[in-house]
């Protein structure tokens, strides 16, 4: 999340974990699913998730991650909503408030997923690079399938609930194909979301169900 990532925010509802993960995955900008569904939280503003030792959040004001809550969780842009996003991910509110304040002041925020047994190593690496206000959240991040997806029932509930039956089939077909080629779940998930994005648009409920014309 980059500098000047701020503006006025109007609270329009409440955030749940189900609301917090999946939206940016649809653009191919986010890889991996935090808690299984980092779905759009904020309107008109987003952050970029890129791969680097698991998903890393590293972005400026890019409309990718937080594009309009499917259930109207928060409307607006990062501003006041950022604390809600981070606390929903499990971060203490006081720490989230510090991050929001410093981000609004023009600094940067980096969120990365690393193996739990190497968390100390990565913390030292970030500190040596000048990182401040480090915080660790001990969470296991959900994945769309436990290995190959044999049927829609194998998809995590958060992913499945945001895909129509046709989109589920597209996701599974592409996911399994890339997984067989690479044995890399991370790459397979990215490719699967890209395939869905190419063939479908979201409906008003945040479900990828509207087939694109000519696809």
Curated annotation (Swiss-Prot):
SUPFAM superfamilies, sorted: ChaB-like
Organism superkingdom: Bacteria
Any single Pfam family the record assigns to this protein: ChaB
InterPro entries: ChaB, ChaB_sf, Low_temp-induced_all0457
Record protein name field: Uncharacterized low temperature-induced protein all0457
Species this protein is from: Nostoc sp. (strain PCC 7120 / SAG 25.82 / UTEX 2576)
